Structure formats: structure tokens, C-alpha cells
Curated annotation (Swiss-Prot):
Residue ranges annotated for the S4 RNA-binding domain, each copy included: 90-175
Organism: Arabidopsis thaliana
Domain of life: Eukaryota
The organism's taxonomic lineage, starting at the top: Eukaryota, Viridiplantae, Streptophyta, Embryophyta, Tracheophyta
Enzyme class: isomerase
A molecular function GO annotation: RNA binding
Catalytic activity: a uridine in RNA = a pseudouridine in RNA
GO terms for cellular component: mitochondrion
Pfam family, one: PseudoU_synth_2
Name under which the protein is recorded: RNA pseudouridine synthase 4, mitochondrial
CDD domains referenced in this protein's UniProt entry, alphabetically: PseudoU_synth_RluA_like
Length: 477
């Protein structure tokens, strides 16, 4: 009896603070009963359920795209892609946690136990228009249909801890640096950004790296997105040219799968001539001339540790050991040879291994890339200085982030790396994701292919002009 009185007193105090009508009752027991009935009624009547203003509305449920599966389908021979995610397994609880990751799971589960979560189902009318149903209670494990909305009490924001999560400080750019980074953008759509990366700018941070594309993208290249662009493939620090960034997590998953499946497919099943697949072309200036005008290099690579474990390098695996060996395939074509011992090559990597093009050129073709001192040091020591007949003074301009964007051509004492990611063809990911939002089984027979071409960096363009002029001079003589 004492416990009941204590509970009654506690409930009376709570209701007095929340309900102004409690003081109008002379009989406390009747007051408690009326207030309790009023509280229960607010969650049970249709009229209150249809008052959308008192609820926190989550986005309508949409199919989850399995980016990995989509990437595999794109590189297959079929004309459709499927989202392999089984939407019937997406429960109300899972959708709430996905839309509101800031809400503690225990709080969301408590809302379900208190029957304070509502569902508004979407129903098709004549196959075209969508009609909304009344709000109804939903259980945590109930599966959602496409278009369903979940409603939560507005009080959840008050019950959520207000301590903001620790955020990683973004790289701070000056106006001049921001303008420079934005000038690298060649293409932008809702799914991807394509950059023309300059020589000397690292793609990802690490030991001894002050500035990277990864940091700069988060600071300067968000544009209208709340998410930072994500890396989906790599270029060496000294390699220039086309670099693709994903603007959303879904686009990143699809692109990761495309780059990965391209390598896996070429290694295991040979080259697939699929018009929707990824295609990449590089341009390189090498020392010497390959024995043939064109060909395909298929040489496995492995990593070796040198300098007492202080560094590592990639080398062709000649001894047939399969341990830590990665198959690598490169197609090459001679563009033009110079009488001074240099050759312009077009390189097509069919797999994406670390330092693949540099090692294949140096160790398989015997023609290291100009400026590649890691894999072509001996060739550079024996290289005869290229003396230009033209007066090409080196500009001493100030470049952002300490980049050396002047000089470095073939006439320099230490030329920059002459390897440039010049062309990329890839499926239109933005168009694909739009199709997938409409249907999880999408026809991609008419999917567009995006083609990008990056102009040569200044040091390679100058080398091209110098060698071209020397060839013309020799022809005249």
C-alpha cells in the first residue's frame, strides 16, 4: 500500500508539470485517471496520428544499391544490372538507424517498446500515382516497402546526447590555393569528379607528405555535397593526369568494384572487350626503343624489401614463385621514336598493380621512363645530356603547395617523371544510379560511356616540342 501511494504521488507530480488540467480536479484519483487516459489517447486515435506536425519524418525508404554487385554486372556481358540487396530484409529498426546514426540504438529500441514509432505506407493508384495511408504503429522487425515513411516523436532530439562527435580538422586553403585546386577539375556530375592531377602532388597523405589530393578534396571540392569526395584509385605522386573521385558513398562502392573487377577479370579470364568496361591510356617518354612497335606484356610482379627494410620496390617475378605474386598485363604501342634515343609510348594497363607501368617499361621492355630514378637509375646515369637548339629559359614562378610546375623537361639535368594518365573511359555512374533508384533491375544497354582526355603537363609538352623540333631539323639536314 505504501508503495502504491509513493507511485501515485510521483505520477501526480509528473502530470502536474506536464498537464495544466490536473489542478482542476478536486479528486486526485479521478485526475490521475483522466490524465492517464489523455496520454494514452494521444497515441491511439486516428485524428492524432494524422497530425503530421507532431512527428519527426524520416526520408522515404528506397532500395539499397549493392555497389560491389553493380560493378561486377557492369563488367559482365549482360545488358542489365541488379541490386542484389534483398529489400524485404530492411526492417523499420534498421532504416531508422541508417537515417539517424546519431540516435543511440537503445533509445530507438525503447521507442518501439513504448509503441511510439509510426509508419506511413505508400500505395499505388492505377499503377502511377502514390497515395499515402494513415499513420500506423510499426514493430521494429517489420519489413519496409519502397516509399514507406517512418515517423518518430519530436522528443527524440531532446533525448539524444547533444555532444557533437569529434570532427577531423579539414585542411585550410587560402583563396589562391582553393582557386588552383578548383582549376584542376575537368568534369563534375552528381556521382563523380575528374581531376587533372599535377606532377608532384600526392594522392593520399602519409609519412613526409604535407599536402594530398585526399585532404584538398575534403576542403575545396565538396561543392553542393555534404560528403567529401572519396578516392577510388591511385596515381603515383610524380605521375600526372586523370584522377577520378567519387562524390557519394554509393558511387565510391561502384567505382571501387569497377577498378577491382577490371584487374581481377583481366588476370583470371583474359582481356574482355566490353564497351561498358573501364579503359585507361597513359602516355610516357622512355629511354631507348622497344624491340617491337606494339605488343602485350604479361609479367607477374612481386614486392621486395631493400635497404635493410627501410624501403621497398616492385620487381618482375622471374623465379616462378607464386607467393605474394600479382599478375599484371600491359599493352603498349610506339607513338614516335627520336634519333636521340627517346621513344613516346602509349600504355594501356589492363590490370591495376602498384608501379606496374614503370616496372614493365624498365624491366620487360628495357626502356625505363624518363624521370623514373627508382627503376631506371642506371639508364639515367648513362643518358647523354640533351642539348636544346632553342632557348627555353626555365620559369621561376611560385606554385601552390610548393609544387615544381616549371622545368623538368628532357633537357633538364634531372627531368620530372614523364608518365601521364591521358585518357579514361568509364560508364556513366550518375546515369546508372538514377536508373537504379527507379528499378533494382535496370537495363544498361543504352548506358552512356564517359570519355576524358587530360592535356599533357608542361614538362612533357615541352619535351614533346623539343624532340619534335630536333626530328624536323635532322630531316632538313
Amino acid at each position: 500500500m505504501a508503495k502504491w501511494r509513493l507511485a501515485t504521488a510521483t505520477l501526480r507530480r509528473q502530470l502536474q508539470s506536464s498537464s495544466p488540467t490536473i489542478s482542476t480536479f478536486k479528486n486526485p484519483t479521478k485526475a490521475l485517471s483522466a490524465a492517464a487516459h489523455q496520454s494514452t489517447r494521444s497515441y491511439s486515435t486516428t485524428q492524432t496520428d494524422d497530425s503530421r506536425g507532431k512527428w519527426l519524418t524520416l526520408p522515404p525508404f528506397s532500395p539499397t544499391i549493392d555497389g560491389t554487385a553493380v560493378g561486377k554486372d557492369l563488367l559482365s556481358d549482360g545488358d542489365s544490372v541488379k541490386s542484389s540487396t534483398d529489400n524485404s530484409k530492411t526492417t523499420a529498426l534498421r532504416w531508422i538507424l541508417r537515417c539517424r546514426p546519431d540516435l543511440p540504438r537503445t533509445l530507438v529500441q525503447k521507442l518501439f517498446r513504448l509503441r511510439q514509432v509510426r509508419r506511413e505506407m505508400s500505395m499505388s493508384v492505377d499503377g502511377d500515382e502514390l497515395q499515402r495511408s494513415q499513420l500506423k504503429r510499426v514493430a521494429a522487425k517489420e519489413s519496409l516497402n519502397v516509399g514507406d515513411r517512418i515517423y518518430l516523436p519530436l522528443s527524440v532530439d531532446n533525448d539524444t546526447p547533444q555532444t557533437p562527435p569529434a570532427k577531423k580538422e579539414s585542411f585550410q586553403c587560402s583563396d589562391e590555393e582553393r582557386k588552383f585546386v578548383c582549376s584542376l577539375v575537368l568534369y563534375k556530375d552528381p556521382a563523380i569528379i575528374v581531376l587533372n592531377k599535377p606532377h608532384g602532388l600526392a594522392v593520399q597523405g602519409g609519412s613526409g607528405i604535407k599536402t594530398s589530393i585526399d585532404e584538398l578534396a575534403a576542403s575545396c571540392l565538396k561543392f553542393d555535397k555534404s560528403e567529401s569526395p572519396r578516392l577510388v584509385h591511385r596515381l603515383d605522386r610524380d605521375c600526372s593526369g586523370l584522377l577520378v573521385l567519387a562524390r557519394t558513398q554509393t558511387a565510391a562502392t561502384v567505382l571501387h568494384s569497377i577498378f577491382r573487377e577490371k584487374t581481377t577479370g583481366a588476370s583470371a579470364y583474359g582481356v574482355k572487350k566490353n564497351v561498358k568496361s573501364l579503359k585507361r591510356k597513359y602516355m610516357a617518354l622512355v629511354i631507348g626503343c622497344p624491340p617491337r612497335q606494339r605488343g602485350q606484356i604479361s609479367a607477374p610482379l612481386r614486392k621486395v624489401v631493400v635497404d635493410d627494410g627501410k624501403s621497398e620496390r616492385i620487381t618482375v617475378n622471374d623465379n616462378g614463385e607464386l607467393v605474394s605474386t600479382q599478375h599484371a598485363i600491359t599493352e603498349y604501342r610506339v607513338i614516335e621514336s627520336s634519333p636521340h634515343g627517346y621513344t613516346w609510348l602509349e600504355l594501356r594497363p589492363l590490370t591495376g598493380r602498384k608501379h606496374q607501368l614503370r616496372v614493365h617499361c624498365a624491366e620487360v621492355l628495357g626502356t625505363p621512363i624518363v624521370g623514373d630514378y627508382k627503376y631506371g637509375w642506371q639508364a639515367h646515369k648513362a643518358r647523354e645530356p640533351f642539348v636544346s637548339s632553342e632557348n627555353n629559359p626555365t620559369k621561376q614562378s611560385s606554385s601552390p603547395f610548393g609544387l615544381d610546375l616549371d622545368g623538368g623537361d628532357v633537357s633538364s639535368k634531372q627531368p620530372h617523371l614523364h608518365l601521364h594518365s591521358k585518357q579514361i573511359d568509364l560508364p556513366n555512374i550518375s546515369q546508372l544510379l538514377e536508373k537504379m533508384q527507379v528499378s533494382s533491375d535496370s537495363d544498361i544497354s543504352d548506358l552512356d560511356s564517359l570519355k576524358f582526355d587530360a592535356p599533357l603537363p608542361s614538362h612533357m609538352q615541352l619535351s614533346f616540342n623539343l624532340l619534335k623540333s630536333r626530328v624536323e631539323t635532322c630531316d632538313k639536314n
